[in-house]
């Protein structure tokens, strides 16, 4: 398979859900930023796990338990390699990006933030990367600061340097905005944070599915992402953390394999990574995530990037031919595969409902980013997003549906 391309028609055949019709129209699924679809290869490994070696992991000595343990720990190694983490202990399986960020806020944050310290975020963050830091700041009487954004929703180096200072203890930032498609230079931001003695926690929910990641190059202290946005199952996420930081952090959930020894009045914890994986682990989900990673790697990130870039630029241009349609965020050549927009005088929920009648699935609402909506001066928006199984035909179907929506709402009854 060519490094810079893949056969999208063959890819589409791997996704059974895309074969169906919605409202008697072909399904154009343009909501992968919320949740991606799942290829048959992932469905098959999940089916195989439950049919052939469903068992708990680590402590069982029987054959099924050993097979399940191998599958689970091999998945951890797959993730480690996928993001080029240095040690397997740095890969913690969680319920998702939100759970991962909350572990950092509660475990690292509570132990390292004091009164008067500063936590730096941006207004483009998902609620899951604002609220945990808000609550930490309240608990510790610390200050939450925001890096200013340009009119296009991007960050300027001078503003980053002006906001992060010696009082900063944590910088929490999205690698890619789930609303604007802004791609932040987290490597540079990490360098600036470290120069001031701060750590950086990166929300990678929208980057891990779409771009090659190298933790040793980025030098992030913590990095979080979810399986369901990258062709994997729901209910599985990853927290990457530098080993030396995780070793000094206390667990936030207790029970199961994270226990080393329990007496009547005290307990000690297992070593990494198990220390942060209380209860029965997400075994099937981790195995499914590993298969999703294999699928992505087989396509290749260069090819994925080129495919999404062409689709996004095409959609951007076609959508702007519609009078009264406004697109938010960076120019077409500086954004990820997401286009957030509004049609003048039509509520985004009406837009999403109307295009759904034409088989087009888009998201409408504040996208868990109410501070950003306020910054944009709107209450909500519609959002289309693109992934490996999308085509120009999907874009054309969206544009035609938007034109019909505009015409319908312009009609005087």
Swiss-Prot record:
CDD domains: SufS_like (cd06453). Its cofactor is pyridoxal 5'-phosphate. The modification N6-(pyridoxal phosphate)lysine is found at residue 229. SUPFAM superfamilies: PLP-dependent transferases. It catalyses: (sulfur carrier)-H + L-cysteine = (sulfur carrier)-SH + L-alanine. InterPro entries: Aminotrans_V_dom (IPR000192), Cys_dSase_SufS (IPR010970), Cysteine_dSase (IPR016454), PyrdxlP-dep_Trfase (IPR015424), PyrdxlP-dep_Trfase_major (IPR015421), PyrdxlP-dep_Trfase_small (IPR015422). Keywords: Pyridoxal phosphate, Transferase. Gene3D superfamilies: Aspartate Aminotransferase, domain 1, Type I PLP-dependent aspartate aminotransferase-like (Major domain). Its EC number is 2.8.1.7. GO terms for molecular function: cysteine desulfurase activity; pyridoxal phosphate binding. One of its GO terms (biological process) is cysteine metabolic process. The active site is at 368 (cysteine persulfide intermediate). It holds the Pfam family Aminotran_5. Catalyzes the removal of elemental sulfur and selenium atoms from L-cysteine, L-cystine, L-selenocysteine, and L-selenocystine to produce L-alanine. NCBIfam families: sufS. Belongs to the class-V pyridoxal-phosphate-dependent aminotransferase family. Csd subfamily. This is Probable cysteine desulfurase. The lineage of its organism: Bacteria, Bacillati, Bacillota, Bacilli, Bacillales.
């Amino acid at each position: 398979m060519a490094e810079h391309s893949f056969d999208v028609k063959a890819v589409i055949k791997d996704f059974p859900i895309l074969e169906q019709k919605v409202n008697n129209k072909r399904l154009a699924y343009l909501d992968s930023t919320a949740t991606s679809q799942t290829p048959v290869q992932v469905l098959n490994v999940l089916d195989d796990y439950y049919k052939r070696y469903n068992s708990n992991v680590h402590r069982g000595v029987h054959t099924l338990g050993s097979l399940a343990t191998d599958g689970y720990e091999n998945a951890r190694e797959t993730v480690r390699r996928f993001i080029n983490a240095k040690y397997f202990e740095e890969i913690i399986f969680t319920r998702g990006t939100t759970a991962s960020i909350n572990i950092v806020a509660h475990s690292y944050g509570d132990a390292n933030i004091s009164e008067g310290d500063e936590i730096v975020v941006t207004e483009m963050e998902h609620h899951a990367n604002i609220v945990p830091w808000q609550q930490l700041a309240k608990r510790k009487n610390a200050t939450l600061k925001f890096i200013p954004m340009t009119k296009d929703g991007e960050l300027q180096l001078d503003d980053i340097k002006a906001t992060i200072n010696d009082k900063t203890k944590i910088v929490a930032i999205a690698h890619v905005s789930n609303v604007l498609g802004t791609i932040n230079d987290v490597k540079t931001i990490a360098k600036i944070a470290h120069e001031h003695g701060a750590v950086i926690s990166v929300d990678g929910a929208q980057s891990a599915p779409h771009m090659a990641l190298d933790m040793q190059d980025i030098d992030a202290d913590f990095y979080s992402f979810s399986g369901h946005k990258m062709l994997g199952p729901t209910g599985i996420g990853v927290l990457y953390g530098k080993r030396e930081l995780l070793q000094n952090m206390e667990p936030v959930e207790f029970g199961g394999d994270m226990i080393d020894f329990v007496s009547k009045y005290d307990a000690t914890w297992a070593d990494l990574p198990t220390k942060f994986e209380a209860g029965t682990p997400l075994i099937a989900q981790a195995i499914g995530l590993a298969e999703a990673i294999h699928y992505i790697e087989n396509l290749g990130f260069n090819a994925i990037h080129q495919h999404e870039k062409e689709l996004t630029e095409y959609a951007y241009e076609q959508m702007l031919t519609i009078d009264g349609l406004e697109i938010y965020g960076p120019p077409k050549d500086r954004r990820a595969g997401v286009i957030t927009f509004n049609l003048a005088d039509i509520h985004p929920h009406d837009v999403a409902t109307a295009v759904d009648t034409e088989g087009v699935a888009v998201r409408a609402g504040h996208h868990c980013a109410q501070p950003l909506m306020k910054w944009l001066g709107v209450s909500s928006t519609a959002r289309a997003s693109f992934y490996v199984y999308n085509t120009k035909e999907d874009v054309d179907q969206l544009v035609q549906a938007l034109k019909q929506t505009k015409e319908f709402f312009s009609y005087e009854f």
